[in-house]
Amino acid sequence: MMIAQELGIYVVESKGGAILCLLLSLLCLGTWPALMALLERRGRLPQHTYLDYSITNFLAAIFIAFVFGGIGESTHEAPSFITQLTQIQDNWPSVLFAMAGGVGLSIGNLATQYSLAFVGLSVTEVTAASITVVVGTTVNYFLDNGLNRADILFSGVGCFMVAVCLGSAVHSSNSADIKAKLGKLSGDCETVTPEECQRLFGVEEEEEEEKEMENVKEGSAAFLIALENKRAIKVLGKSMVVGLGITFFAGLSFSLFSPLFNLATNDQWHTLKQGVPKLIVYTAFFYFSLSCFVIAVALNISFLYKPVLDSPRSSFREYLSDWNGRGWALAAGLLCGFGNGLQFMGGQAAGYAASDAVQALPLVSTFWGIYLFGEYRRSSTRTYALLVGMLVMFTVAVGLLMASAGERETRFT
């Protein structure tokens, strides 16, 4: 069975069930960034989008905790989610680990939203995911006392490192392609004005301009200029170092949350008193998501009034009245919430090092980037060759990390 009822809670028991959870998680976690990028490209403020996303992300955690962690009889060895909420005076060290992991995820996701605009969906996800795997997987391997096969696991880590190099080369080559396209259209690529966009399309009304933009060929210079005038975060002419710096920061933040969640549920550092049951996955995920939600709301309300990276200023009233794209933002939160929950459920059974295989989500994100946004359309042959190489290495990497999965023998003692 993939999911079994054990001592009143539902747990993933088999290696096959764990891998299925990880594959579903991979699909969810690879899709939600595409929705965030879509809204930014349509002009919705990132602060508005992230606040909506945070609400449903937290609701998904509550649903998972109550449905999978609160059904059945609670015992001392395996208390239910509800029971563990009343035991915080005993299990608070593990709760703090879980909440610290949530802070790391929230800051990482927030940074990702801005890096998506600066360096694109594919390169952002490749770089951030690879840093997460290299740092987080190594830490998880030692926390799990070698639960995963080291030879296979670290071969996968090596493939991710190669993919990072190829991803950087893809971005460099694609940036050169874009510069060449814009150079043919205008001698000044650092300044894009509405007047130039109007000259391209020969329209005056915004609605007509949007209609004309749909008819512009993806990847063309005209398309790039029209997109720049429409999007919420202006990026043309900005230093590539800014975007890459944000992406590296996001990756380092992401690399912390999985090891911290591992410590919260397995207590490898023996911070709990003898006889105190470890946090079940669902309780840890609830506290993890709670801190993620609080940090996200606090930071983004602040960013409404004091925006970063030249984003437009807003207010809480304007956020409440902004229904343009809200459904997509709420959907992104659900995808991320359920994706994280599935990752942790699979990781508890197969080992958290193997669960980091979901960091191969750039495979999914790159598909959406090419299909939805026309990334790399009309690029050079060199860019296409590097892109294929990057995707091949990611495919090999995720296969190796999943093949390294072990099975955890003890969960509740």
Swiss-Prot record:
Residues 1-18, 72-91, 137-149, 262-278, 348-352, 406-413 are extracellular. Proton-coupled transporter that transports a wide spectrum of oxo derivatives of heterocyclic nitrogen compounds, including allantoin, uric acid and xanthine, but not adenine. Mediates transport of uracil and 5-fluorouracil (a toxic uracil analog). Proton-coupled transporter that transports a wide spectrum of oxo derivatives of heterocyclic nitrogen compounds, including allantoin, xanthine and uracil. Optimum pH is 4.7. Residues 40-50, 113-115, 171-240, 300-326, 374-384 are cytoplasmic. Pfam families: Ureide_permease. It comes from Arabidopsis thaliana. ATP binds at A232, I233, K234, V235, L236, G237, K238, S239. Belongs to the plant ureide permease (TC 2.A.7.19) family. It is a multi-pass membrane protein. Expressed in lateral roots, rosette leaves, stems, stipules, flower stigma, pedicels and the connective tissue between pollen sacks. This is Ureide permease 5. GO terms for molecular function: allantoin:proton symporter activity; ATP binding; protein transporter activity; uracil transmembrane transporter activity; xanthine transmembrane transporter activity. GO terms for cellular component: cell plate; endoplasmic reticulum; plasma membrane; secretory vesicle; trans-Golgi network. The chain crosses the membrane at residues 19-39, 51-71, 92-112, 116-136, 150-170, 241-261, 279-299, 327-347, 353-373, 385-405. GO terms for biological process: nitrogen compound transport; response to salt stress. PANTHER family: UREIDE PERMEASE 1-RELATED-RELATED (PTHR31081), UREIDE PERMEASE 5 (PTHR31081:SF16).
